[in-house]
């Protein structure tokens, strides 16, 4: 076994911490304990000292070293990542130490087994940000496992569970992280499995109720989210980007695109369902039901184009600053437009709902009421998500530059803390997906636009718009192209037929076709 032994010399002004030896003797030990191995250091030394900020490397034989600032370093099989926290007497760490630490000649060095001192580069930051010690900065060095075999020994301050919890919940970014922070490793697994289950349920329900033409976008979006969070799980272990490896960056961009494009497509699915509800009660529709998908779809086409372009520009760590700002602005415009479209949807839905009540649509309109309430809840979830994204974008004073701690600290706390993402993005979209599993429109709405609800409560098969005569894939393509392939402009103002006969439909509904003068027996 290749063994390395390093000693960390720690000093904090006004305190005498109890140091304990932490021995990492196997990969399992490191894997189990690595989140707790942190060294708390106050960086300050006389100007004449080689440790004077910005600290530099004097060990060119070790990987990643050279006469330049860095945010991390590697020694043997260990990787040390720098995180910084500014503190004062009111902060978490000021309260922890009882006061704001004063300047001291505290520094940290690592020694090889030969006891020959080798000062290592510890921080990447500007000289200006480190030349003033008021307020001071606390550094955390976290040991990461790189490869086997290894053994290491540290002399470090013992961290209490309270301290460790404080550090773990911090929103301080990590330099070099594609996500800005260190992504949670368990959450993507949960959401990948949950969205996969929803995808399977949607697919089964579409087959069971013959509702592929009605709601096929729901299983498609759930599958898109499944892929996005599966790739995010890969990114949770490969989030540090140094500009050399292409795979982490490419998969990160693909993951972001999948997660960002899902909600606008879910909106499009809701607009398509609203159009089908208008077909079902055409005399209460605010305008021609056949134009709903084309109208909302045209607006969502713009949103999708802006979102896709914006994500691809902002997620690319190699892009220029001007390019990232352009992507940032495109996303802001897309989100603002998305919110406007939601307001238009709500207005038309409420207007339609009031017309149904005024027309005293009979008891069979339970299908309409149930579907409308589900649409309202779904759009509320998407609206909250849009507001979250707008706040995230609008409160960030700069585009993401993962190489600069100063730029990262200017980002919105909403962007720097992963908890907000899972609360207002992932969770809301998962709830929306399962909402349509529970309140699937298949059992309530007829499977084609030929069927509508007459004012006496019977379901009547009228002329229709011809869309059900097209192949399934052609209908899907029309929806995916935002209703622009076919424009169903036929008049849908049906008259009340006098004689009908019953014909069972595949999804459990009863069709009533116009008879030739005789009543069905």
Swiss-Prot record:
One CC-aspect GO term? membrane
Residue ranges of region Disordered? 493-521
On induction, the UniProt comment says: Expression is positively regulated by the phomenoic acid biosynthesis cluster-specific transcription regulator C6TF.
Primary site of residence: membrane
For this protein, the record's InterPro entries field holds: RTA1 (IPR007568)
Which residue spans traverse the membrane?
186-206, 211-231, 249-269, 292-312, 332-352, 371-391, 418-438
> Where is this chain's protein located in or outside the cell?
Membrane
One matching Pfam family is RTA1
- Statement: the UniProt record of this protein carries the keyword Transmembrane: yes
Which keywords does the record carry? Answer: Membrane, Transmembrane, Transmembrane helix
Kindly give the membrane topology term recorded for this protein.
Answer: Multi-pass membrane protein
Is the keyword DNA damage in the record?
no
Summarizing the function annotation, the protein's role is: Lipid-translocating exporter-like protein; part of the gene cluster that mediates the biosynthesis of phomenoic acid, a long chain aliphatic carboxylic acid that does not appear to be essential for pathogenicity but may play a role in allowing to outcompete other fungi in the environmental niche via its antifungal properties.
Family statement: Belongs to the lipid-translocating exporter (LTE) (TC 9.A.26.1) family.
* Protein's name in the database: Lipid-translocating exporter-like protein RTA1
Q: Which organism is it from?
A: Leptosphaeria maculans (strain JN3 / isolate v23.1.3 / race Av1-4-5-6-7-8) (Blackleg fungus)
Lineage here is:
Eukaryota, Fungi, Dikarya, Ascomycota, Pezizomycotina
Gene that this polypeptide is encoded by:
RTA1
